[in-house]
Regions:
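Nucleic-acid modification enzymes, centered on SAM-dependent nucleic-acid methyltransferases
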Residues: 9-312
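Long, structured ligand/cofactor-binding scaffold of large enzymes
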Residues: 1
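Conserved SAM-dependent methyltransferase scaffold
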Residues: 4-5
């Protein structure tokens, strides 16, 4: 934002700007004054270290007795079939990621969620649990759910804003890191009981912070909208965009930023805090071929994600 103001200032003009959007105003004001800031503020490192000490243990996983950092947590929306009442995981396919360069893909069993590395042209997964999974035959496509039990189809969006059910999410897989620096490698695994317990621990810690909740719980405005998203998918409040571990992270980070006395350092942190919300919510997707997150508003709309990824 503020391109005309910033470029005019580069030409030594005295600039004055107005905007009705407080976020745009904050960003542009920061851009205009950034040249006067220092290159480094120790307060920023202190905030990162303080929050990391509290949140990083909740982003660890155990593999063969050893602990590793989790890079991405994979979630999937679960919806009940209107006809047979079975619970259906809304997977667009059963592929977590792929690499054209390595000619590999990482897929998971739709029954037990075990993750396998296969050649990229493989169409069927023969899992060690004894079940077969057709990799591209997902249960969700273009807003329509197909029940694997009764084969009936239904829309996942509600017909009106008031009848939409709040999404139910299930943690089913993780991408974790082995090694450090140039020797660091990325691996996939299904979630185990220890991973679920870490999430529940985060939920309990969040409950202890209820009196200082910084995540906005106000209703998303309905007036003046061109479509019903995200309310037709059960997202009615801004807090509904985040799971409990993300809310804990946001609260701890927000509280730490509030304590920073240096105004310039705090402004830098506030801007980074605002920007990182789009990649730390349950509307964050995963770019399968690039193995990285695709933030909220990457296509300039409330695109509903049935298989979001939670970033460390």
């Amino acid at each position: 934002g503020g391109t005309s103001l910033v470029e005019s200032m580069h030409c030594n003009a005295r600039v004055i700007g107005f905007d009705i959007d407080p976020i745009a105003t904050f960003i542009t004001r920061f851009e205009l004054s950034a040249s006067q800031f220092e290159n480094h503020y120790p307060e920023i490192d202190q905030v990162c270290e303080e929050v990391a000490r509290q949140i990083m243990p909740l982003h660890r996983t155990k593999v063969d007795g050893d602990e590793y950092d989790v890079l991405h947590h994979f979630w999937v929306q679960v919806k009940k079939c209107d006809y047979c009442h079975s619970e259906v995981e809304l997977h667009p396919h059963f592929q977590l990621a792929y690499s054209k360069e390595k000619k590999l893909q990482w897929v998971f069993c739709k029954y037990c969620h075990a993750v396998h590395e296969l050649p990229i042209n493989r169409k069927i997964l023969e899992c060690s649990c004894g079940k077969r999974t057709t990799i591209q035959a997902g249960t969700y496509n273009n807003g329509i759910m197909t029940c694997p039990n009764c084969k009936r189809t239904q829309k996942i969006a509600a017909d009106n804003l008031d009848s939409a059910e709040t999404p139910i999410w299930k943690l089913f897989a993780q991408e974790y890191l082995v090694g450090v620096g140039r020797n660091c490698t990325r691996h996939f695994k299904r979630t185990e009981q220890d991973d679920l317990e870490r999430y529940l621990y985060a939920k309990r810690k969040l409950e202890c912070l209820n009196e200082v909740n910084l995540v906005p719980n106000r209703l998303i405005p309905r007036e003046g909208r061109s479509d019903g998203r995200p309310m037709i998918h059960g997202i009615r409040r801004y807090s509904d965009f985040f799971n409990d571990r993300q809310k804990l992270h946001l609260n701890l980070l927000g509280l730490a930023i509030q304590k920073v006395e240096n105004n310039e350092a705090r402004r830098c942190l506030e801007l980074a805090f605002s920007e990182h919300l789009t990649a730390n919510c349950m509307y964050t997707a995963y770019a399968f071929g690039y193995r990285r997150t695709s933030p909220l508003f990457s296509i300039h709309s409330y695109r509903h994600i049935t298989r979001p990824v939670e970033l460390n």
